[in-house]
């Protein structure tokens, strides 16, 4: 089992959805880089569910805690360990999944892969909460790049008119269904020649990272499939 992404700058994730905590270890960060705790927490809060009717009802504070690698507001050069404690868990809701896994989730394949020793509660290590350390690591990495990153939700269920989104989401919720959407991301300040010619091209590596997010079903670059 491998849970590490990256080469020069790496992130290793750990923990399960209903365990004591989930987190990550960031390695490759140079010493002396200023760590803006308020900015990191603000980015974490953007990801935090339970703030509206269109996200999961699970409400966690998602308070970031640094265990190592930061001293007096700056990186020390050693690995940066980050955790988020779990609190709002109802493990009894997942008892039935031991016999009847959820369609489209990792319940069945995780059980097969690890001979039933996996933690199925809340999706275990396959939970969407594992994206928490990814967001934290990405926020730290931005300090190294000098690039500007922007993201915007532009479509929900094929609908681009924002005024119709709430009605569409209400109807979908009443029907007990779910729908997809499109998030548009823009990066400026990217240096020319970034990436390798073939397997490690910028698009290849970005796609690798993006498809690690459980809900991502497709990635387009530039004009996409136009």
Language-model features: where?
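Glycine-rich, mobile lid/loop segments that gate access to catalytic sites or pores
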Residues: 112-198
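Conserved phosphate/anionic-ligand binding catalytic regions in large, soluble enzymes, centered on
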Residues: 9-30, 129-141, 199, 211-214, ...
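Short beta-strand elements
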Residues: 10-15, 22-27, 80-82, 110, ...
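Solvent-exposed alpha-helices and their adjacent loops that cap or buttress functional pockets
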Residues: 1-6, 15-18, 58, 72-76, ...
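Glycine-rich, N-terminal phosphate-binding loop and its surrounding beta-alpha-beta segment
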Residues: 43-103, 107-109
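Glycine-rich anion/phosphate-binding loop at the beta-strand->alpha-helix junction
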Residues: 14-20, 175-226
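N-terminal, positively charged regions that mediate nucleic acid binding
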Residues: 1-58
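Structural signal for hydrophobic packing residues in well-ordered secondary-structure cores
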Residues: 44-52, 84, 88-90, 112, ...
């Amino acid at each position: 089992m491998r849970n590490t992404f990256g080469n020069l700058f790496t992130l290793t994730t750990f923990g399960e959805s209903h365990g004591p905590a989930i987190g990550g270890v960031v390695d490759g960060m140079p010493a002396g880089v200023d760590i803006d705790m308020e900015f990191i927490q603000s980015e974490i809060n953007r990801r935090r569910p339970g703030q509206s009717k269109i996200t999961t009802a699970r409400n966690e504070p998602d308070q970031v805690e640094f265990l190592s690698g930061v001293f007096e507001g700056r990186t020390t050069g050693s690995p940066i360990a980050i955790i988020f404690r779990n609190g709002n868990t109802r493990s009894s809701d997942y008892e039935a999944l031991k016999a009847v896994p959820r369609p489209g989730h990792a319940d069945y394949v995780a059980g097969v892969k690890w001979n039933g020793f996996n933690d199925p509660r809340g999706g275990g290590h396959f939970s969407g909460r594992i994206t928490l350390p990814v967001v934290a690591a990405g926020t730290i990495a931005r300090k190294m790049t000098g690039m500007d990153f922007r993201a915007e939700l532009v479509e929900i269920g094929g609908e681009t008119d924002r005024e119709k989104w709430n009605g569409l989401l209400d109807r979908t919720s009443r029907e007990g269904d779910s729908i997809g959407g499109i998030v548009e991301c823009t990066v400026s300040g990217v240096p020319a020649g970034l990436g390798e010619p073939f397997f490690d091209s910028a698009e290849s590596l970005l796609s690798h990272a993006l498809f690690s997010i459980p809900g991502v079903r497709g990635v387009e670059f530039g004009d996409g499939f136009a």
